[in-house]
Every structure is written in C-alpha cells, then in structure tokens.
C-alpha cells in the first residue's frame, strides 16, 4: 500500500495540512505558532494532520510571524579545550539543557576567547538568530555583556561579574553561588581541625568568583586571628597546571604552612601533586580543601575535601531566569545566589 505521506511530493506544506485537517490555512498557522485563539477540536485536527503528513514548520517564516527564533545562546569566554575538558562547564551545560526542555528552546553553544571567535559570536548575537543570551566565565574587561544589552537581547550571566563585587554596584540578572560564604566555611573547617598557618591558591582577580573566594578566605582568617600576609596567597586560573605552579610558590615562600584553601578542585588536584613531590603528607603535614565538588574531588589521592557548589542547579536557574526575561516577566529577584557546603573527605 502507498501511504498518503509517500504520495505527497516534496516537503508537506501548510496548505496540505489545512486540507487534511479540514480547516483554513490561518488556523494551521495559529496552531503552529502557539496561539491560543484556536478551538480544542480544531487544534486536535491540525496536530493529527501534522503528525500524519510529517509536516515541519518553516522556521524562517515562523520567525517573521512570531518575532521569535526559539533559540538561545550560551557563550563561554574560555577555550574549547577548557570548556570540553573541565567538569564545571559540562555541569552548567547539563543544567541549562534540562532547564530549557519544557520551554522548547534550542541551545546554541559557543566559545569566545580568541579575537576570531569573539568576532563570529558578535555577528550571531542578534535578534535574528537568538531570543536571549547566557554568558559564562566572564572576565572584567569582557565587552560582550554591554554588546548584548545594547542590542536589546535578554541577558543572564553565569556568576556575579567582578564589577558587582564592588561597593555601590547595582545588581544585574545573574546566577551565582555563595562564594564568600563557601570560602569562609573552608577556612572554618581547617581552623577547627587545628590548622594555624592557612594559605590559599586564589582564582583570577578579574572574575567575580576569584575575587569573592579570596575575600571569604581573608575574612575567615581575620575572624580566627590567622595571618593573611601576601606570602600566604598565590594565584591561578582555575586549571590543574596553575595549581601545580602556585603550590610550588607557596612552599618556597612559606614552608611552614599546614593547610591550603584552593579556589577550584582542578587547582587543588595540582596542589596535591606538588605536595606529594615535596614529600609532604596529606593531610598530616598539609591539609587541602578545594572548591566545586566536581568529579575530580573523588578521583584524587587522597580524595579531596571541598566546598560543594550546585553546578547543575546553577545552569537550571540560568535557564529559568532567561526564559522569564524572554517572556517579559519580572521575578521578585533578578538574581539567584545558591548555597555552598563543605564536603569532608580525606585531604582535610
């Protein structure tokens, strides 16, 4: 037997769907574009005809009618190697994807670290291509937030920008974790276990997370009467290699350190390697606490005590806020800050 679909030449059209459903072309168009100005009976007939014919809407034509692309962008200001190699980014993408499922929005992912990548991204971030934008791993001098706002696109940031950590800065649309509180809890844990010379490997100081975690470390050290001099602070870019190098610096400057709070699990894994190479026992000689509670924390030797941030929940919240902005809604708060907790394992 030959099915109706196989007899239809080429791609099914709106008119063919209307004929099959026994309704007008306008009714089909309203169903396809999500209008509620259609009776339940007519909607059911149209949806049945669409399924039988295998009709796929012309997205370009639909966009002209709805002024929507049904796509959103996630732009990460990091290299492709880091985005696909580090657990944090994978968790964020999983969370965003799950948050967009019910909204039927397609996710467009791009990296924007090099000048060429940034130029391509800038050409794509228009209302003709996407309905909204999420930006992640922003550095202080990144021009993308201002560009997106100037183009009138709904925008949500992953992480509090560095400028918003300064006194008097106004809040924006963002999702973050309690970085200051998490760092304080890490130092509290080290102090409670008898550590008195607590060093830190801080993140980049042109990023909100890097600034906040260092501030939390310093506040907790002051509260416990611990030293926070420059010799106890080294810096890294959240990578494994940076953790290796920063731990070497700390051991050279202050061989008497008995603990270290590290602003990211990958850097903490690098620090553990350097400590082992230096003959330091962990945690007997030096205790180590990381930040993230990524899969890396369970794979290190010894396993890593760390501050847990709910990465996938952060991605889902980013998607929720962006959907609200696209719909023109005004939530009670334009930002979300998620709690952090210390997960105790062998390294501290």
Which residues make up each language-model segment?
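Hinge/beta->alpha junction and helix N-cap segments in small-molecule ligand-binding domains
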Residues: 78-91, 109-117, 174-185, 201-248, ...
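Flexible loop/turn connectors
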Residues: 7, 248, 252-348
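N-terminal helix-turn-helix DNA-binding module of bacterial transcription factors
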Residues: 1-70, 348
């Amino acid at each position: 037997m030959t099915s109706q679909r196989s007899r239809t030449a080429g791609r099914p059209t709106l008119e063919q769907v209307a004929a099959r459903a026994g309704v007008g072309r306008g009714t089909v168009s309203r169903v396809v574009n999500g209008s509620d100005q259609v009776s339940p009976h007519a909607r059911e007939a149209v949806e049945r005809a669409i399924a039988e014919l295998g009709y796929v809407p012309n997205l370009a034509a639909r966009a002209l009618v709805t002024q929507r692309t049904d796509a959103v962008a996630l732009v990460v200001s990091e290299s492709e190697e880091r985005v696909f190699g580090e657990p944090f980014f994978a968790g964020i993408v999983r969370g965003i994807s799950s948050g967009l499922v019910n909204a039927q929005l397609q996710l467009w992912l791009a990296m924007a670290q090099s000048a060429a990548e940034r130029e391509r991204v800038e050409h794509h971030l228009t209302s003709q291509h996407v309905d909204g934008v999420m930006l992640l791993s922003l550095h202080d001098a990144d021009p993308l937030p201002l560009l997106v706002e100037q183009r009138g696109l709904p925008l949500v940031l992953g992480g509090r920008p560095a400028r918003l950590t300064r006194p008097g800065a106004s809040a924006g649309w963002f999702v973050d974790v309690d970085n200051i509180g998490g760092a304080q809890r890490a130092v509290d844990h080290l102090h409670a276990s008898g550590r008195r010379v607590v060093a830190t490997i801080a993140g980049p100081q042109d990023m909100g997370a890097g600034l906040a975690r260092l501030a939390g470390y310093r506040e907790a050290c002051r509260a416990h009467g611990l030293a926070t001099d420059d010799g106890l602070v080294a810096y890294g870019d959240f990578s494994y290699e940076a953790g290796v190098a920063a731990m070497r610096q700390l051991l050279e400057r202050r061989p008497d350190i008995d603990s270290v709070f590290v602003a990211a699990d990958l850097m903490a894994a690098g620090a553990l390697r350097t400590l082992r190479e230096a003959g330091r026992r962990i945690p007997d000689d030096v205790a180590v606490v990381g930040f993230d509670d990524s899969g890396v924390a369970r794979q290190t030797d010894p396993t890593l005590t760390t501050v847990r941030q709910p990465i996938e929940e952060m991605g889902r919240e980013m998607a929720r806020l962006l959907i609200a902005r696209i719909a023109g809604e005004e939530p009670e708060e334009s930002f979300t800050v998620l709690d952090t907790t210390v997960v105790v394992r062998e390294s501290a």
